[in-house]
Amino acid sequence: MRNTFLEFEQPLAELENKIEQLRYVQADSAVDISDEIGRLQQKSQTLAKEIYGKLTPWQTALVARHPQRPYTLDYVREIFTDFHELHGDRMYADDQSIVGGLARFNGQSCMVIGHQKGRDTKERAARNFGMPRPEGYRKAQRLMRLAEKFKLPIFTFVDTPGAYPGIGAEERGQSEAIGHNLYVMAELKVPVIVTIIGEGGSGGALAIAVGNAVLMLQYSTYSVISPEGCASILWRSADKAPEAAEALAITAPRLKDLGLIDRVVNEPIGGAHRDPRVMARLLRRALGDSLRQLQDLTPEQLVEQRLERVLAYGRFQEVRG
């Protein structure tokens, strides 16, 4: 699949096009131009490193939404084995914007739950663009309770612009479903490890993000509102989204400094979508480290530690001049 380039990546796109053209020439010619191709590839890597080394928060938000970025099921295939998907909330329907099921992580049984967007138009519509309805959150809740019953660690993957705001979702209790998930996750007596892999949009993200350890990929985002939504409220114009992104503190390093996440997982040069397998290997290692740190804790200690994390949200220190 050809890479899709964002607006700020245009110099990189032009260089990649030159490399592609030279490959076609080499295939049809007896002239060896492999050295020139290698030189341009090295230049492309250097340029990508420069561009991604100074991303603004708004550019990071664009990378987090990249259409080729790995989704939950991509990581499930690369990191877990024996995945068996479970469906439905046992009350209304099966929401495909949240996927989950039993799997093995490094040979250990576990439960995996995550938001899932789509790759093409048909799948995006079926998965509601990764925006869960109440039945999606209730499905996640059911799987968490099942994991607790069998004493299985839980891995969740967050990637949503937010909970679906449709009339039907509100009628079926969207806010209740999100709120109840927070309550349930806070008291689970098994390890819960959360990873923000793309967009972490508001309560729709938080509903599966109350964990003992919260990891965040380097170019993912996590915020109470999208930059465009914030700009529309404050400045009455979505054009101010870059300024809103700066003020919202949506990036992984800022959130780590604020104590809202525990670990930033570095991505390959150019983002996770440039090399999904390398990204999966890096994430597998980080997940393994987190699980090892939690496995010696008793159920009571797990609950206490998780509650301490949640109650620390919003703490501040007042400094008087």
UniProtKB/Swiss-Prot annotation:
UniProt GO cellular component terms: acetyl-CoA carboxylase complex
EC number(s) recorded for this UniProt protein: 2.1.3.15
Entry-linked SUPFAM superfamilies: ClpP/crotonase
Superkingdom as given in the UniProt entry: Bacteria
Subcellular location(s) per record: Cytoplasm
GO annotation, biological process: fatty acid biosynthetic process; malonyl-CoA biosynthetic process
Keyword annotations: ATP-binding, Cytoplasm, Fatty acid biosynthesis, Fatty acid metabolism, Lipid biosynthesis, Lipid metabolism, Nucleotide-binding, Transferase
Keyword check for Lipid metabolism: yes
CoA carboxyltransferase C-terminal domain sequence ranges: 39-293
Single GO molecular function: carboxyl- or carbamoyltransferase activity
Reactions accelerated catalytically: N(6)-carboxybiotinyl-L-lysyl-[protein] + acetyl-CoA = N(6)-biotinyl-L-lysyl-[protein] + malonyl-CoA
Main localization category: cytoplasm
Pfam families in the cross-refs: ACCA
InterPro entries noted in UniProt: Acetyl_CoA_COase_a_su (IPR001095), ClpP/crotonase-like_dom_sf (IPR029045), COA_CT_C (IPR011763)
Biological pathway: Lipid metabolism; malonyl-CoA biosynthesis; malonyl-CoA from acetyl-CoA: step 1/1
The UniProt record lists the keyword Lipid biosynthesis: yes
Family: Belongs to the AccA family.
Subunit composition and interactions: Acetyl-CoA carboxylase is a heterohexamer composed of biotin carboxyl carrier protein (AccB), biotin carboxylase (AccC) and two subunits each of ACCase subunit alpha (AccA) and ACCase subunit beta (AccD).
Function: Component of the acetyl coenzyme A carboxylase (ACC) complex. First, biotin carboxylase catalyzes the carboxylation of biotin on its carrier protein (BCCP) and then the CO(2) group is transferred by the carboxyltransferase to acetyl-CoA to form malonyl-CoA.
Protein name per its UniProtKB record: Acetyl-coenzyme A carboxylase carboxyl transferase subunit alpha
Record organism: Bordetella avium (strain 197N)
